[in-house]
Amino acid sequence: MNQPNSLYLALLIEAKWQNPEDFHFSSDFAKHWLLEQGSLSRRLARHCQHLTVELMRNEKSGVGQLTMQETQGLSPEICLIREVVLSGDQTPWVLGRTLIPETTLADQPYDLATLGDIPLGLTVFSAEQVERDALQVAWIETPQGRLLARRSRLWMNHKPMLVAELFLPDAPIYSRESV
């Protein structure tokens, strides 16, 4: 993993999450991105010719390797940790970290552990039963300035996973920030 991604990931894991009603959004445009209930992957794909996934990590981890914040949204069990960078036309846009409990991996129509470079959102939002709850947002201070992030719990066929996403400096969420 390269140095900027390592730093971004560490900052994302330690984010100070807030409920949307308590958060100061920089614009209505950013608010719509952060509160998106559907697939972020699909939304990103509409802003580029080629949406790609760089898989940085895809391995099971014990409960002891998760933060207290992360375990609050899930049952305490071994999770698959999937960390990726989503890029639009070769420009990094979003760093994602997903925690998928072993019980969520079981009995699904898709093998979430072997997605590789397929965007998770495209797979999850293809399932019959998908819901998002516990949506939170954050500003994350980086050497490049403040960046926006969101975290939510996705339910796929009534089984949870925790998804955190950091919008990198060139992400489309910032394209209308000054408008």
From Swiss-Prot:
Protein function: Removes the pyruvyl group from chorismate, with concomitant aromatization of the ring, to provide 4-hydroxybenzoate (4HB) for the ubiquinone pathway.
Q: What pathway does the annotation place this protein in? A: Cofactor biosynthesis; ubiquinone biosynthesis
Q: What is the first-listed, main subcellular location in coarse terms?
A: cytoplasm
Subcellular locations according to the entry = Cytoplasm
Q: What is its EC number?
A: 4.1.3.40
Catalyzed reactions per annotation = chorismate = 4-hydroxybenzoate + pyruvate
Spell out the Pfam families in the cross-references.
Chor_lyase
Q: Which domain of life is it from?
A: Bacteria
Gene Ontology CC: cytosol
Q: Which SUPFAM superfamilies match?
A: Chorismate lyase-like (SSF64288)
Q: InterPro entries under this entry?
A: Chorismate--pyruvate_lyase, Chorismate_lyase_/UTRA_dom_sf
Keyword Translocase attached: no
Keywords attached to this Swiss-Prot or TrEMBL record, sorted alphabetically, are: Cytoplasm, Lyase, Pyruvate, Ubiquinone biosynthesis
**GO terms of molecular function:** chorismate lyase activity
Protein name per Swiss-Prot or TrEMBL: Probable chorismate pyruvate-lyase
Return the similarity comment.
Answer: Belongs to the UbiC family.
Is rRNA processing a UniProt keyword of this protein?
no
The UniProt record gives the binding positions of substrate as 82, 120, 165
Q: Would you kindly state one Gene Ontology biological process term found in this protein's UniProt entry?
A: pyruvate biosynthetic process
